[in-house]
Amino acid sequence: MNPFLISVAAVALAEIGDKTQLLSLLLAARYRKPVPIIVGILLSTLLNHALAALVGEWIGRALGPDAIRWGIGISFLAIALWTLKPDKLDENDAAKSHGSVFIITFVAFFLAEMGDKTQVATVLLAAKFHALYAVVLGTTVGMRIANVPAVLLGKAAADRIPFQAVRLVAAGLFALLGAAALVTGG
């Protein structure tokens, strides 16, 4: 399995309908400045997922292969269930200050991503693959695939995306990854 491609697919699917994608829509609708929003999302994701991947690499080295296999398998199954539940984002959760759109986006995204399923997936992927750069780049590309169209197309696109169907596909992917980890160790 290619760590980069698995990371792209897992995070892109998990991000559909996620609170950070909803945050992208809110920021785009409120500020109507796609470039600083997109750059803020990129840099925030890189930092957040790099830190998450470092934690994952450390966990991967600190625990034995059997503990990693069981932890990853059970965690991916839990993420599959978590993915089925639609996220909600209250407009009050989005930054309301009049500061720089880039800084607002960077901080809001970094904080919204803390403990989010895509951050948890990044930790797990890094623990599994021991490929820090491939996982960070893959998860960042996955976030871009899901969030850039949300910023550029705004609410009109969100109304047309079949979120329930995408959530089912994403949940299925995480369930398959979890089952594969438990059954085959990989």
Feature map (PLM): residue ranges:
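Juxtamembrane helix-entry segments on the extracytoplasmic side of multipass membrane proteins
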Residues: 1-5, 66-68, 100, 130-134, ...
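Juxtamembrane transmembrane-helix termini in multi-pass membrane transport proteins
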Residues: 2-61, 121-142
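Short hydrophobic "helix-edge" motifs at membrane interfaces and signal-peptide entry regions
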Residues: 7-9, 103-107, 152
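Membrane helix-loop-helix hairpins that form the core translocation module of multi-pass transporters
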Residues: 32-101, 149-160, 165, 169-172, ...
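Selected transmembrane alpha-helices and immediately adjacent juxtamembrane segments
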Residues: 90, 94-119, 125, 129
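Juxtamembrane boundary at the C-terminal end of a transmembrane helix
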Residues: 179-186
